[in-house]
């Protein structure tokens, strides 16, 4: 099994760029920068895309330009055009249930109330069996404060932790392609930014 599409979830526009909900896109932006593959807007895929080669594998990068709750439109369009199966997709998203400084790989599962994941599952024919990179952003402690929290900007100290976890996740993505998912997962899951 190889990953052929890596997606970073976000809301579009400058006003959302630095918000916690865009943590998935920060990861794809970093990968694109590391692999010297600048993202370009591609309207037919409703997002910014790029093509990279990782260990000889052809991989597409995607940051949807739809709002978060319509992310499946972009993922579905690209998956269908390139005939990419759900288990060949890695979706990076912000995760309330992990603290800043932690990121984890996961295959399948529910959407946990994340509207981006919910729409992707829906547009992939109700198939939740794609890989996820869960980027920890922490939780406000009260479910009524979640919307304001994910659409807020983290303080500098938290931003550094999130950035460090994303940096490690990008390194572990390369490990995944070189040495397999188990090795990449073990390394990433042992990491906690200080």
Curated annotation (Swiss-Prot):
The record marks 94 as: Stabilizes the basic form of H active site to accept a proton. Keywords: Cytoplasm, Hydrolase, RNA-binding, tRNA-binding. One of its GO terms (biological process) is protein quality control for misfolded or incompletely synthesized proteins. Its EC number is 3.1.1.29. GO terms for molecular function: peptidyl-tRNA hydrolase activity; tRNA binding. One of its GO terms (cellular component) is cytoplasm. It comes from the Bacteria. InterPro entries: Pept_tRNA_hydro (IPR001328), Pept_tRNA_hydro_CS (IPR018171), Pept_tRNA_hydro_sf (IPR036416). The keyword Metal-binding does not apply. It is found in: Cytoplasm. TRNA binds at residues 16, 67, 69, 115. The record marks 11 as: Discriminates between blocked and unblocked aminoacyl-tRNA. It holds the Pfam family Pept_tRNA_hydro. The keyword Acetylation does not apply. Disulfide bonds: none annotated. It catalyses: an N-acyl-L-alpha-aminoacyl-tRNA + H2O = an N-acyl-L-amino acid + a tRNA + H(+). Belongs to the PTH family. HAMAP family: Pept_tRNA_hydro_bact. Hydrolyzes ribosome-free peptidyl-tRNAs (with 1 or more amino acids incorporated), which drop off the ribosome during protein synthesis, or as a result of ribosome stalling. Monomer. This is Peptidyl-tRNA hydrolase.
């Amino acid at each position: 099994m190889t990953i052929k599409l890596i997606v970073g979830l976000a809301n579009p526009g400058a006003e959302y760029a630095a918000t916690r909900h865009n943590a998935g896109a920060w990861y794809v932006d970093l990968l694109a920068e590391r692999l010297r593959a600048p993202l370009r807007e591609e309207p037919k895929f409703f997002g910014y895309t790029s093509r990279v080669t990782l260990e000889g594998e052809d991989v597409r990068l995607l940051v949807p330009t739809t709002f978060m709750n319509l992310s499946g439109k972009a993922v579905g369009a690209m998956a269908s055009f390139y005939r990419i199966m759900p288990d060949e997709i890695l979706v990076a998203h912000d995760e309330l249930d992990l603290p800043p400084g932690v990121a984890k790989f996961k295959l399948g599962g529910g959407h946990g109330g994340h509207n981006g994941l919910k729409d992707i599952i829906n547009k992939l024919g109700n198939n939740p069996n794609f890989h996820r990179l869960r980027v920890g952003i922490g939780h406000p402690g009260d479910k009524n404060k979640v919307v304001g929290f994910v659409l807020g900007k983290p303080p500098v100290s938290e931003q550094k932790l999130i950035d460090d976890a994303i940096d490690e996740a990008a390194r572990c993505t390369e490990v995944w392609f070189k040495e397999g998912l188990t090795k990449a997962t073990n390394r990433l899951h042992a990491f906690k930014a200080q």
